[in-house]
Amino acid sequence: GYGNGGNHPSSSILPGLLASGNALNDLVLPMIVGYEISNRLSAATHPRLTRTGFTPTAIWGPVGSAVALCKLAEEPYSCIRQAVAISLFCPPIGLFSYLQEMVSAVPQHHGWAARFGSDAVHLSRAGLNGSDNPLGGQKSLPDLLGVELNFGSPSIELDGETIKTVYTKREIGCRHCHPSAALARALKKSRQVEIEAIESVDISTYKVALGFSKVPDERQELYACLMSIPWIFSANLIFGEVTPHLLTDRFRHPEILRLAKKVQIYESSDAEAHYPLSLNSEVSVKVLGLRESLKLAEVMSYSSESDLFAPESLFDPAFGADELTSKFKKNCAGVISEKDTHSLVNLYS
């Protein structure tokens, strides 16, 4: 995801490019162009768009998708302009509350964003047009969404490369769960805590993350678990990591849900003051028999440029090419053959 914009450019831009059937090397420049367009629009409206209640990927993903496909096909400026305008007519207006309610259909909005960008290009090629000023004026899309796009503002960077602050998720789960997951692993490494002796867990964090404080019900639907700070924290504290295998077998581990029900999430004024530049969280664990609670704080930033796949935090090391390859192989184990895994690693290296 793009830390400075709250969006996930890969999920809306890569599907259309990969579906084109072109050689991977031919997709690199169009991908970068698509990333830059959607990222800069996202950055210009972040975190206001999220706080207003909408998902940045659904809003700005179609624009990036359309521009990337136009770049791939070397379309003329007139086609690009109309494709962008059409993509801003009725993009999938993803409601952020659906993420917080753990609605399992939510991941589909990435695909809708990708498809709408592709459709916009087809319509533009056919001669259809969009608005002359799709991003400005009263009742434009930004106006209706309650955000502003001032292209003279310092918040909109027209130089530099936003792609350098698009980072790989180092672990399974919503990005807003990651600070708490890191805290859980740090606790597991530093203190041998008897899980059943834990009486309560208090996590203090920024306001947006409060929306991910629900505990999954007894069904433990997959998306609900991935979007739950209590569940992700508990799974990491018990097992040290959330793996595809653990997700598959989650019903065999009722202790995760039992611990998750003891987790409470609170707003921290300090963490809120640092959001969105960094995703900060503090945890306090009350353990039976211990006079004082166990306390740790995590500072996790995705806003600074790095050539790594994920920057370091207080408890997690930086995520380089070797770490990414190792993680990929580990996640593929038991899902696809070792031979196919190595082929994919060689293909994308």
Q: For each predicted feature, which ranges?
A:
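Terminal-appendage/accessory-domain detector
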Residues: 1-6, 102-115, 122-349
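N-terminal core-entry segment
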Residues: 1-164, 174, 209, 349
